Each structure stands twice: as C-alpha cells, then as structure tokens.
Amino acid sequence: MEPKGTSIQDIKRPDGISYFPFKNGRCLAWDYTCPDTLARTHIKKFTSTQAGKAASRAEDGKLKKYRHLNNDYYVVPIGIETLGSFGPHALDFIKDIGHRITESTGEKKSTSYLMQTIGMAIQRGNSSCILETVQDSKKLDGVYYL
C-alpha cells in the first residue's frame, strides 16, 4: 500500500517514506539522487566552479518534483555526487540522523561514522562511474587498472 498522495503525475514516487512522524508531526519522505560529477553537462556549468553544485541542483529538482507532498510529509531530497560532494539537504539530513543516534546511544562519533560509511559506499561505485564517463581513447593505453 502507498501512503495517500505520494504518487505523482509521472508515476514516480519518493524512494522511501517513514510510517512514523519524523519531524514537526510529519512522516519523512526521501528521494536519493547521485549526479555524475564528471558528466560534461555538470563540469561546464556546475562542478568546475563549486563543489557540490550538481548535488545541490539535483536536490532542488527533487524539491520541485515533490512540492505537493510538503504539507503532509517532511520531504528530504538527498543529493550526493559521484565524487562524494554532498548537497546541502543531504548534509543537514545526515547530521540530523547522526545527532539522533548520538542522543539515543551516547556515542559522540555517530555522525562522523555515518558520514564515513556513506563516503565509503560512494567510493565503491566511483570506478564504474569514472570508467563510463571517460571514453575509449588510444591516449589511455598506458593506464593500468588495479
């Protein structure tokens, strides 16, 4: 079953929705996106001028996409670029989760651990993203893959 109002015109839905109130009495609805930092469209306009700009723009797009849910849900767009730059909403959300874990467990390094765990997961996927972005070239014949 889908919670009421989560389906939109293009049949896409948020990646997840909590069944309990998360903040201000509203349930959490999140949607994750991972823009390619090295994509030509991002390098020319965004990532060459400011770290995290592609992630920030992706988050803004998610907020517009789910604006109709804002009255019923606490909508969090999570944008993290392939090379690890966090969008502002993603960073605030992760810090909030880390703070909640710290309050619950007393472990002061919860936020740091959470950030490192997410960073490692992103790094695992980086090699495939980079290899897909870099086109085949004879200039790359001297590159050795480990």
Q: What residues fall within each predicted segment?
A:
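Non-catalytic C-terminal interaction segments of nucleic acid-processing enzymes
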Residues: 1-14, 22-28, 34-146
